[in-house]
Amino acid sequence: MRYQGGKARLAKTIAPILGGGGTLVSLFCGACNVEALATRNFENVICNDNHPYLIAMFKALQNGFEPPDVVTEEQYKYLKANKDENPALTGFVGFACSFGGRWFEGYARDGNGGNYALSGKRSLIKMMPNLRNVKFICSDYHDVKLPDGCIVYADPPYNGTKQFQNKKFDTDEFWRYMRLISEDHIVFISELHAPDDFVCIWEKQVTRTLDRNKDNYFKATEKLFIHQNNIKRLQQTNDE
């Protein structure tokens, strides 16, 4: 499913790096591309996101919800104005059928005649067997209970972008909290940049575009960080 900042192309590489075993907690699950693959390696996976319509969609999918094959621009505008009429459908349309996968930022059109609703539906149906037993919760990331010994994965909004309800993401507070929970857990953070006390353990250059129908591609380097105090703990875990 189209989702701004989703890790669809990188999930197969990132998921194995997270390791396996007991419980994985994802603080910003988004489109769940990484999490869907990580379920193969962990006994339990908890997926959190503070976007209620996104979580409503995933919970409904677990219970048999089937997204539509086609969403017209009129239907798109209606759901944008009446979000609570069908939260699961709103969650699907708000991302899968929006320009750039950005929450209701304009009805997506493909100059080549592509069907964004059908494409999003197919990708979700393909991943749902892996997400069938995932626990989905909707909360601020600070409020997510972290089980003892769990692995934490954080893929926060890009610096400067807005969250649900147009609240700007506080990057400084995010890194402060990552330091705090790194005292008791191995925490992996997907980001482009990090403070000096966080170590990059993996990186890959990717090509992005603001609009696939225009010639505005640019390069970015996706990275995976852990706190410097977690390096020895991670090495010990990998040696076990």
Regions found by a protein language model. Give the residues of each.
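S-adenosyl-L-methionine
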Residues: 1-36, 40
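Hydrophobic "anchor" residues on beta-strands that sit immediately upstream
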Residues: 22, 45, 151
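Short His-Asn-centered micro-motif
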Residues: 27-29, 48-49, 137-139, 154-157, ...
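Short, polar loop motifs at secondary-structure junctions
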Residues: 29-33, 121-122, 190-195
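Short loop/helix-cap segments at secondary-structure boundaries that form the rim of catalytic
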Residues: 37-40, 144-148, 193-202
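Class I S-adenosyl-L-methionine-dependent methyltransferase module
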Residues: 41-138, 142-143
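Active-site segment flanking the S-adenosylmethionine/decSAM binding pocket
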Residues: 135-171
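Long, positively charged, glycine-interspersed low-complexity recognition regions
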Residues: 166-240
